[in-house]
């Protein structure tokens, strides 16, 4: 009685051992070579600039960018959005001076507004009160004409319509009216990292400087 039972147990054990060996030799679905590896399914490392949008770092600036980008108020100014100020009041006539257009643009009109505003507010005043924008400058003659008209005011700098757009390696200088950035008249050492993201024109000499967009300054509209 005991011998047949023992024989049955031995045969059953050998069958189970053979089945286990076959299972271990087969491939696990979790290790299938056709499944993507971690490197293949990971997301992109970072956003790349569109073709032609790269800008070399500003003078003395490291690739990772300057600390000025985190200055409160500057980010909003470079977005190009107008100030949502329902109580915006247009400047009084005595606070403005009309400037002549240059010989290459008889229809161009410029306006000096002596009332000091931040960059965003200045752009909003130009748009809402004069149906224009902060001035874009594309030639030395225009730059010289504007500087000659503003050098008598008791302010060292005035806003024009230039700004830095984008971040990191994708930073570029742009005009708020969307025109081409084909002329610049920077002061020595400019554009300077940490100096801000909006562009001013110096009333003495006419050179340009970067400034923090939240500063209040007189400004030049073109319309």
Curated annotation (Swiss-Prot):
Annotated signal sequence range: 1-16
Matching CDD domains: CLECT_EMBP_like
Domain C-type lectin: start-end pairs: 124-223
Compartments in which it is found: Secreted
InterPro entries: C-type_lectin-like (IPR001304), C-type_lectin-like/link_sf (IPR016186), C-type_lectin/snaclec_domain (IPR050111), CTDL_fold (IPR016187), EMBP_CTLD (IPR033816), Eosinophil_major_basic (IPR002352)
One GO molecular-function entry: carbohydrate binding
Post-translational modification (record): Nitrated.
Region (Disordered): 20-81
Protein name: Bone marrow proteoglycan
Alphabetical list of Pfam families matching this protein: Lectin_C
Glycosylation sites: 23-24, 66
Cellular component per GO, a single term: extracellular region
Propeptide: 17-106
Disulfide-linked positions: 126-221, 198-213
Stored Gene3D superfamilies: Mannose-Binding Protein A, subunit A
Function in brief: Cytotoxin and helminthotoxin. MBP also induces non-cytolytic histamine release from basophils. It is involved in antiparasitic defense mechanisms and immune hypersensitivity reactions.
Highest taxon of the lineage: Eukaryota
Any single biological process term in GO: negative regulation of interleukin-10 production
Keywords: Antibiotic, Antimicrobial, Disulfide bond, Glycoprotein, Immunity, Lectin, Nitration, Proteoglycan, Secreted, Signal
């Amino acid at each position: 009685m005991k011998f047949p039972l023992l024989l049955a147990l031995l045969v059953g054990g050998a069958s189970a051992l053979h089945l286990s060996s076959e299972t271990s030799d087969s491939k696990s679905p979790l290790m299938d070579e056709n499944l993507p590896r971690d490197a293949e399914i990971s997301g992109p490392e970072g956003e790349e600039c569109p073709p032609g949008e790269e800008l070399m770092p500003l003078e003395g600036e490291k690739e990772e960018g300057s600390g000025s980008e985190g200055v409160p108020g500057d980010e909003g100014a470079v977005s190009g959005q107008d100030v949502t100020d329902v109580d915006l009041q247009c400047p009084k006539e005595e606070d403005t001076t009309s400037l002549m257009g240059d010989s290459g643009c008889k229809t161009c009109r410029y306006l000096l507004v002596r009332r000091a505003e931040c960059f965003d507010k200045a752009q909003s005043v130009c748009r809402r009160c004069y149906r224009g924008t902060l001035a874009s400058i594309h030639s030395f003659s225009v730059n010289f004409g504007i500087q000659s008209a503003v050098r008598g005011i008791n302010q060292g700098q005035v806003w024009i319509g230039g700004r830095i757009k984008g971040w990191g390696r994708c930073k570029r200088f742009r005009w708020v009216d969307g025109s081409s950035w084909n002329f610049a008249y920077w002061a020595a050492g400019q554009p300077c990292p940490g100096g801000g993201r909006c562009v001013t024109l110096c009333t003495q000499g006419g050179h340009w400087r970067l400034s923090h967009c939240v500063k209040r300054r007189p400004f030049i509209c073109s319309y």
